[in-house]
């Protein structure tokens, strides 16, 4: 019977496919600290793309916008509308924060699908989208938490903490717990979706190298953009909620 050898070969093939280095990391040793180099390298590339694009956008503005200037003005208007819808009339000071979050996450997500990170060999692990790492998404979520605390305290002072006993003091533990669940949901939603998308593409390429992975890659680009929009929308909604003081 050839059932056992076939089963062993199948398991071996699945093991090779599952050998994607998800938990492997490349570190820089600086003093007594280990710095997660993979995330820094890819984040610097994303930041360079954003800064380069911004420099091109403002280099020579025209009264009658060109195609490139039209695109950047559309992006800015989109971010303003998003901020105004979620935050309200006091949205102005928060447009740079919401815009930075949206653009960084959007470009990071797309870089995982469009940039050939895998051709750069590292001693350990491999390069991937910055948002493919839980450290990045947690940092973004904590920045969002700090932003909505700052917004609430700036607007209401110490009276901001009165929201924890509204509409009744019985809800105090739940209201406190909510401040922990917000960054958790933001970070794990973004991390899980981007990681799953990249793993699905890697597995499909390993199984069927031609044609089949292409629709999945396009779907990944779409969902990557949606995830950036969801994160920015929720961040703006949390800031607006803290300034208004209602749930």
From Swiss-Prot:
It is found in: Plastid, Chloroplast thylakoid membrane. GO terms for cellular component: chloroplast thylakoid membrane; plasma membrane; proton-transporting ATP synthase complex. Key component of the proton channel; it plays a direct role in the translocation of protons across the membrane. Belongs to the ATPase A chain family. The keyword ATP-binding does not apply. GO terms for molecular function: proton-transporting ATP synthase activity, rotational mechanism. NCBIfam families: ATP_synt_6_or_A. It is a multi-pass membrane protein. The chain crosses the membrane at residues 38-58, 95-115, 134-154, 199-219, 220-240. HAMAP family: ATP_synth_a_bact. This is ATP synthase subunit a, chloroplastic. It comes from Ceratophyllum demersum.
